[in-house]
UniProtKB/Swiss-Prot annotation:
Principal localisation: membrane
Localization in the cell: Cell inner membrane
Record keywords, A-Z: Cell inner membrane, Cell membrane, Fimbrium biogenesis, Membrane, Protein transport, Transmembrane, Transmembrane helix, Transport
Record note on what altering V182I does: In strain: PAK
Organism: Pseudomonas aeruginosa (strain ATCC 15692 / DSM 22644 / CIP 104116 / JCM 14847 / LMG 12228 / 1C / PRS 101 / PAO1)
Single GO biological process annotation from the record: protein secretion by the type II secretion system
S-S pairs: none
Similarity section: Belongs to the GSP F family.
Family matches, as Pfam families: T2SSF
Name of the protein described by the UniProt record: Type IV pilus assembly protein PilC
InterPro entries with a match to the protein in the record: GspF/PilC, T2SS_GspF/T4SS_PilC_CS, T2SS_GspF_dom, T2SS_GspF_sf
Organism phylogeny: Bacteria, Pseudomonadati, Pseudomonadota, Gammaproteobacteria, Pseudomonadales
Length: 374
């Protein structure tokens, strides 16, 4: 009844009001970065339409199926309604809104251009999350191929090869070397399959813990990834795009270049670029031009350096950096699509070699027996 009364005050006469149920499937859903990007885009849209801030929270919150996201929006609304600024309200949720995000919102509130800043932040979040998704896709695809190949091979070795093995024992002859190797591998997996699974799990767990706890391990991994064929190029272009996109967004918001570089450092997602940005910050703080400093790092591509130089000379640095980001985002997109196209026949080839090799190994003794009988 309170909801009906509230709506009537706004000139809306509802015929029926019912409580929206919570899906059991969505009850435990986490708040994802794309949820935050959507929230930001909707906030920018609402403010552009002249909807009051507190009312915007109500409308946006109801639009999310994820109950945890609705709860987050409601908590932000409560903070703002109690007198806190939007930026300070967001700072109380650091697990969802990083320092860069909050600083940009703060700049928008201070300058009276919150709508424009939210629009820029929304674009930034959408672009960066899209880029991350493409990188995950590029990395996941070959891993999926390897896993499928291993599972198929394991099933054949554990379930199919033993059927042939009983036949081979009746031959009373020495098996071909290739067949004997496959039989030995089959016997090993039949006896030790559980230990193999535990071992693989232990390796995965150790890798995860090292990545979480050891900075040296993470640094080494980041440097190694950049040197990988195909994947290294995708990660490199992604880091350049994230660098340019972050710096363009912060600089356009009126953040001083040296301060903007603080935000850029962690946004690239790779230690090689993080170290390069730290050096650039030191150089720029002493008066060196951004493009000169980028060149001295030997990390950034010439195109990005030249576009930065043009931006500095013409006074349109944010615009030029945005063009650099868009170019490398498209490059990543094309590279991932090409990789996917390349991997499809590779999957068939790998599976064909594995399955075909096992079949040949099983039939070699039969062919030899046929030759002897002939």
């Amino acid at each position: 009844m309170l909801v009906k009364a509230h709506l009537r005050k706004q000139g809306i006469n509802p015929l029926k009001v019912r409580k929206k149920g919570i899906s059991l499937l969505g009850a435990g859903k986490k708040v994802k970065p794309m949820d935050i990007a959507l929230f930001t885009r909707q906030m920018a849209t609402m403010m552009g339409a002249g909807v009051p801030l507190l009312q915007s929270f109500d409308i946006i919150g109801e639009g999310f199926d994820n109950p945890n996201m609705r709860k987050l929006v409601d908590e932000i609304k409560q903070e703002v309604s109690s007198g806190n600024s939007l930026a300070n309200s967001l700072r109380k949720k650091p697990q969802y809104f990083d320092e860069l995000y909050c600083n940009l919102v703060d700049a928008g509130e201070q300058s009276g251009a919150l709508e424009n800043l939210l629009d820029r932040v929304a674009t930034y979040k959408e672009k960066t999350e899209s880029l991350k998704a493409k990188i995950r896709k590029a990395m996941t695809y070959p891993i999926a191929v390897i896993i499928v190949a291993l599972i198929v091979s394991a099933i054949l070795l554990i379930k199919v090869v033993p059927q042939f093995q009983s036949v081979f024992q009746g031959f009373g002859a020495e098996l071909p070397a290739f067949t004997q190797m496959v039989v030995n591998l089959s016997e090993f997996l039949q006896e030790w399959w559980l230990a193999v699974i535990v071992g693989v799990g232990a390796i995965g767990f150790t890798f995860k813990e090292l990545h979480k706890r050891s900075k040296k391990f993470r640094d080494t991994l980041d440097r190694t990834i950049l040197k990988l064929p195909i994947f290294g190029g995708i990660v490199y272009k992604s880091a350049v795009a994230r660098y340019a996109r972050t710096l363009s967004t912060t600089f356009a918001a009126g953040v001083p270049l040296v301060d903007a570089l603080d935000s850029v450092s962690g946004a690239t997602g790779n230690i090689v670029f993080k170290n390069a940005v730290s050096k650039i910050k030191q150089d720029v703080s002493t008066g060196m031009q951004l493009n000169f400093s980028m060149r001295t790092t030997s990390v950034f591509p010439n195109m990005a350096i030249q576009m930065t130089a043009i931006g500095e000379e013409s006074g349109s640095l944010d615009e030029m950096l945005s063009k650099v980001a868009s170019y490398y985002e498209e490059e990543v997109d094309n590279a991932v699509d090409n990789l996917t196209t390349l991997m499809e026949p590779m999957i068939m080839a790998v599976l064909g070699v594995l399955v075909g090799g096992l079949i040949v190994a099983m039939y070699l003794p039969i062919f030899q027996l046929g030759n002897v009988v002939g």
